[in-house]
């Protein structure tokens, strides 16, 4: 298995990232968050996020399939000069295969100009 880490660029990649976001959100939080809250995180909402915020998102591809993503950027508190990792999600079938580590390393490289990175 060769995983490719790259910027999210095409409509197919945006759709793939949206599906990963929705599926992994359910897998991670279904037993933690109330059902009424979970029901608000729809595939359409994930599509909206992916389309509205395509910049600073790296995807992990297994062949042409999106299997994970990381979103990063400037820390949300402008009083603090730092980079931030906003989201990191990997499909359950890819746990333990180093995909999350590859995504984090790529995000750290993209945030290289910062002395501090906040998770």
Task: Pin down the residues of each PLM region.
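Extreme N-terminal starter segment of soluble prokaryotic enzymes
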Residues: 2-4
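Acetyl-CoA-dependent GNAT
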Residues: 7-93, 104-106, 110
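Conserved GNAT acetyl-CoA-binding A-motif
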Residues: 111-119
């Amino acid at each position: 298995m060769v995983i490719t880490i790259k910027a999210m660029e095409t409509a197919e990649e945006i759709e793939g990232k949206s599906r990963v976001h929705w599926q992994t959100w359910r897998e991670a939080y279904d037993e933690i968050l109330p059902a009424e809250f979970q029901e608000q995180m729809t595939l359409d909402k994930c599509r909206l996020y992916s389309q509205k915020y395509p910049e600073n998102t790296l995807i992990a591809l297994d062949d042409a399939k999106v299997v994970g993503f990381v979103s990063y950027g400037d820390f949300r508190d402008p009083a603090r000069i730092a980079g931030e990792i906003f989201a990191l999600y990997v499909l359950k079938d890819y746990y333990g295969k180093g995909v999350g580590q590859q995504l984090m390393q790529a995000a750290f490289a993209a945030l290289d100009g910062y002395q501090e990175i906040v998770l």
